[in-house]
Structures are given as C-alpha cells and as structure tokens.
C-alpha cells in the first residue's frame, strides 16, 4: 500500500462530519473541549516542571532528565533501558526536534538493552553523541559491554539512575503486598569505579548542583564516559504507582527491607 495515498484518504475522512459532509463550526463546538485540554496540559506541564526543578538529595530522577535535556544537542540520541528508565525518558524529557531521537524497548521488557543498542547506534551514526539512560539493575545485565565502548572509542555517555534497587518490582510489591523483600534492594555499587576499570571517564554525583557540569564533561569526553547518579529510591514516573499511594508518594513506607541499606 502507498502510505501517502493512505494518509490523504485518512485526512479526507477525518475532515468529514458524521454524515459524511465537511465538518462545519455549526455542527460541533469544540472550543470547550479544546479549552479543557489546554488547561489539563498546562497543569501537567507545571507539575512536571516543578518536579524537574527539585533540589532534593538523594537526587530526583526528574531533575536528572531536566539536566540531560539541557545538555543534549538536536542531533544527539537518547537510549533508555527497560523498566523505570523508559518511563523517566518518556515523561520527563521533552523532545524539541523531529526525528527518532529517543529509543526504548517498550513492549519488549528487555533489561540490559540500552548499552548494546548504543553500540549499534554509535556505529551507524558516528557523528552523533549517544546518551544511555539506565537503571542500576539494567546496567548489571550489560556492564561487560563497557569494554566494547572503550575498544571502539565510541562517543557514548552512560547515565546511571542508581536507586540501589529493582525499582519497578519494589513498587509493585509494596503496592500489592504492603511490604518489601530483601532481594529488591542492592548494595551501593560504585559504578564510576567499575566504569573506570573498563577505561571510561567516570564520575559519581550525589547532589543535584554538580550534575549539569558532570554531564557536560562526560559528553565532551573524547571517548565513552559514565555518570553514576545516586537517586531517590521512592520516585516513579508511572501514574498508576502514584495513584495507588496518593500523589506525592504520601503513605509509602520508605523503610528498606530488613538487613539492607536500600
């Protein structure tokens, strides 16, 4: 099928009213609907921007996305790993130019996707800077591929949202069962040290103030780099999670599982 002809036919059909005649202002007044939609959009953007401006410690993932957005150039490419990283990238980063600049494995549920995907993107588009957004759990699946980044001197910056847990599972269990389990929480892995062992330039960031400079330095590095960002464990981009516990995460028991630092 010809996509152009199909789109033209679809546009013609959408321009017609329910009786097949061209839609006219006297047939339907959409102004109230448009006004309501504009109001909801404005309110959502205000909430999003407030969260993105957070100075909280540990660092809010929303702030990380704001800093990434500020650091990206129009031709840069962001690759989000599975689970919460895809949600953070999809909700809190505003794409300001056309084209497929943000990639994620939605529907595939494949943790460890982002670093191997970045290798492919960097090989296919050698002039582009590539940024990986990964949780600490997901990076554990593909940490060995940092050796490939170094061997090929690929311009890939890995940003780790280090919440020291399986974040999605932690939320699911707390919402559905009212408690945490020990296997949800990790020890505090020093990903910057791990990355240096593979030959990457690396920094660990624990407060939001230095985050922008750390990202800029990583993106300007002559080879691959990693920024390990220590983030708040009880943050989520998933609306259903927030609704389950109340907006603002009120009522969530933030106590880590027994014997673990969370």
Regions picked out by a protein language model, each given a short descriptive name:
Residues 1-36:
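Glycine-rich, acidic loop regions that bind phosphate or pyrophosphate groups
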Residues 5-6, 12-16, 124-214:
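Conserved thiamine diphosphate
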Residues 5-7, 86-87, 109-111, 139-140, ...:
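Short gly/pro/ser/thr-enriched loop/turn and capping motifs at secondary-structure boundaries
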Residues 9-12, 89-94, 114-116, 143-146, ...:
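Short acidic, glycine/serine/threonine-rich loops at helix termini
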Residues 38-116, 121-122, 127:
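Active-site diphosphate/adenylate-binding microenvironment
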Residues 208, 214-262:
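Glycine/aspartate-rich loop-and-adjacent alpha/beta segment that forms the canonical ThDP
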């Amino acid at each position: 099928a010809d996509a152009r002809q199909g789109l033209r036919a679809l546009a013609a059909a959408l321009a017609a009213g329910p009786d097949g005649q061209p839609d006219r202002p006297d047939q339907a007044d959409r102004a109230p609907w448009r006004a309501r939609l504009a109001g909801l959009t404005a309110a959502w953007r205000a909430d999003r921007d407030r969260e993105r401006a957070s100075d909280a410690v540990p660092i809010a993932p929303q702030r990380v996305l704001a800093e990434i957005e500020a650091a990206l150039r129009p031709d840069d490419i962001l690759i989000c790993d599975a689970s919460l990283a895809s949600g953070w990238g999809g909700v809190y980063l505003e794409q300001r130019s056309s084209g497929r600049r943000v990639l994620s494995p939605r529907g595939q549920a494949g943790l460890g996707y982002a670093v191997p995907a970045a290798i492919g993107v960097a090989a296919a588009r050698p002039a582009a800077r590539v940024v990986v957004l990964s949780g600490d759990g997901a990076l554990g699946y593909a940490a060995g591929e940092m050796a490939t980044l170094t061997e090929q001197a690929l311009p890939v910056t890995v940003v780790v949202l280090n919440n020291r847990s399986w974040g999605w599972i932690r939320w699911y269990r707390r919402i559905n069962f009212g408690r945490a389990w020990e296997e949800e929480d990790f020890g505090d892995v020093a990903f910057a040290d791990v990355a240096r062992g593979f030959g990457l330039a690396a920094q660990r960031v624990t407060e939001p103030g230095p985050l922008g400079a750390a990202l800029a330095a990583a993106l300007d590095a002559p080879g691959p780099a990693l920024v390990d960002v220590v983030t708040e464990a009880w943050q989520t981009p998933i609306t259903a999670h927030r609704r389950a516990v109340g907006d603002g995460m009120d009522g969530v028991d933030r106590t880590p599982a027994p014997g673990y630092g969370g």
